Regions:
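N-terminal, charge-rich alpha-helical recognition modules
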Residues: 1-72
Length: 72
C-alpha cells in the first residue's frame, strides 16, 4: 500500500486521533477521541475542534472524510 503524501506532516498523536475518531465515529465525541489519543483533558476539546477544522488542518480533515466514506 502506497503511503499518502500530505501538505503537512501528520504527527503520531494526530494519526492516533484519526484512527480513534474513525473507529468510534458516532459513539464517542471528538473530545473523547482526542483524550484517548493522548491529548490532555484540559485541552482535548480545543485540539479536537482544531484537528477537524478544514482551514487549520486540511490534511487531517481530508483523511478523516476519506476513511469515513470508505466505511459506508
Amino acid at each position: 500500500m502506497e503511503k499518502k503524501k500530505y501538505l503537512t506532516k501528520i504527527t503520531p498523536i494526530q494519526e492516533k486521533f484519526i484512527e480513534i475518531y474513525c473507529a468510534k465515529y458516532g459513539e464517542w465525541s471528538a473530545t473523547q477521541c482526542a483524550m484517548a489519543a493522548g491529548y490532555a483533558r484540559s485541552s482535548a476539546h480545543t485540539r479536537a475542534a482544531e484537528l477537524l477544522d478544514w482551514r487549520k488542518h486540511p490534511d487531517i480533515a481530508m483523511e478523516i472524510q476519506e476513511r469515513l466514506a470508505g466505511l459506508r
